[in-house]
């Protein structure tokens, strides 16, 4: 270790990340202290990583963080993620940010202060490339002054902000490619909460825990969109057909429109979602490149509605991975049994049930027949703890049917996942 250049030692310390580990390691010898002072690139203070932080008074914690930060030169990554047990002095926190802002590329900030610290004002017009902001408040955004010319990634979690300020903040980031919005507290200006965001450079967007009346996103370069635990009346995506990956996870939306951007879709992943199948199919049908389609635990507005596998087979000829799980009602033998178009390129098939019945084995058999080049079949099932004699009989019949079926498809690998 004595022969390692201080620059290499600095890289080693930077990979440790956590301030406690960095301080302990840098105490090894003079050379390591020099590496920590001059060549440390990343430093992290996280109350979840080290319970000792919680045992310190706020003043002692401020001193510890201040001493550690001020012993460094040229930090590029700084993470200060503290729980709500401490409220720091705004002056102290501003001193940390002012000392490091000229060289910072990445900042993760979850610090409660009295009064509130305006991160945008302090870190704007600098070289920041990634900003993670949590449990904070943003007001009065001025794009001409609070500009982030190099910012590529922005994450806001549990942040209070108005719809106007959010749009202004996005416009102040001309290079932004990734946006994450988690459980925002949207300041309301009227009875209807509407957000309209526009960015020509956005490629990846993630929304979690967002509840609004209307959300309109205009993103000409978007490739990835993931929405989770959201409640919306209307969501509209406007773009140039660049969207490749679209994921919905436990989302409630009355009117969903991504049709304008769906031409390049390669992955559609929908989980716990209520849909009108004809409308949903029409929305994604423009894509001729779809490779993976996952419709899992979906519910229909109409009890008699089905997912039409014939339209999937005819419309998505490049599909290689198909996953389907929804309630197959007794007597509905027409589920997926109409039509003859095959899913020629599907090699992985995932099928699931929440309540098993006799229709399921028929459904599995028909889908196997539709996939002549299938390599892998995965069956997911929910088995209740309390089982009647009838439940056991249905499960036994299904198991026997699958055993018989797989004798015809010996080239297919079969997996069962029960919960």
Curated annotation (Swiss-Prot):
Keyword Ribosomal protein annotated: no
Residue ranges the record marks as coiled coil: none
Any single Pfam family the record assigns to this protein: LRR_At5g56370
F-box domain: residues covered: 1-48
Alphabetical keyword list: Leucine-rich repeat, Repeat
Membrane spanning stretches: none
Repeat recorded as keyword: yes
GO CC, one annotated term: cytoplasm
Annotated LRR repeat ranges: 53-82, 96-124, 133-157, 158-183, 185-209, 245-272, 273-297, 301-326, 356-381
The name this protein goes by in its record: F-box/LRR-repeat protein At1g67190
Organism: Arabidopsis thaliana (Mouse-ear cress)
Lineage: Eukaryota, Viridiplantae, Streptophyta, Embryophyta, Tracheophyta
